[in-house]
């Protein structure tokens, strides 16, 4: 492992210890709490939508969240380990067969719905 890979692994471990990053993927509905600074005021703003893409690139990992606001589709790309993200919460799990859900951009209403994934049952080992 070279120096850069070692540094990125250490940074990911440090940032993961400070804030829990849940497992989520495309199709999942997430609520991202973002720290917003307006002048001297600081507040936390929630952004809730469907994850349409996720790019796993170590420390540079990011994910794209799409929501419909006032009838318009709004997409926002969040770096996974950004210090401006206070919390990521998975609201519901979606069942999809694609890694990138860019086809949702051209859909409206019921055709843009994503079926909910069946809950994973944990069987007790006897």
Swiss-Prot record:
GO terms for cellular component: cytosolic large ribosomal subunit. SUPFAM superfamilies: Translation proteins SH3-like domain. The lineage of its organism: Bacteria, Pseudomonadati, Pseudomonadota, Alphaproteobacteria, Acetobacterales. Keywords: Ribonucleoprotein, Ribosomal protein. The keyword Ribosomal protein applies. The gene is rplS. One of its GO terms (biological process) is translation. Pfam families: Ribosomal_L19 (PF01245). The keyword Ribonucleoprotein applies. This protein is located at the 30S-50S ribosomal subunit interface and may play a role in the structure and function of the aminoacyl-tRNA binding site. Signal peptide: none annotated. This is Large ribosomal subunit protein bL19. Belongs to the bacterial ribosomal protein bL19 family. One of its GO terms (molecular function) is structural constituent of ribosome. It comes from the Bacteria.
């Amino acid at each position: 492992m070279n120096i850069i890979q070692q540094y990125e692994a250490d940074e990911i471990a440090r940032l993961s210890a400070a804030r829990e990053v849940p497992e989520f993927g495309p199709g999942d509905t997430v609520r991202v709490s973002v720290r917003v600074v307006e002048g001297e005021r600081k507040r936390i703003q929630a952004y809730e939508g469907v994850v349409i893409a996720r790019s796993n690139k170590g420390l540079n990992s990011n994910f794209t969240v799409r929501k419909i606001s006032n009838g318009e589709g709004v997409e926002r790309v969040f770096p996974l380990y950004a210090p401006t993200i206070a919390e990521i919460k998975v609201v519901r799990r979606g069942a999809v067969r694609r890694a990138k859900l860019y086809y949702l951009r051209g859909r409206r209403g019921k055709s843009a719905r994503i079926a909910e994934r069946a809950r994973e049952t944990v069987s007790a080992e006897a």
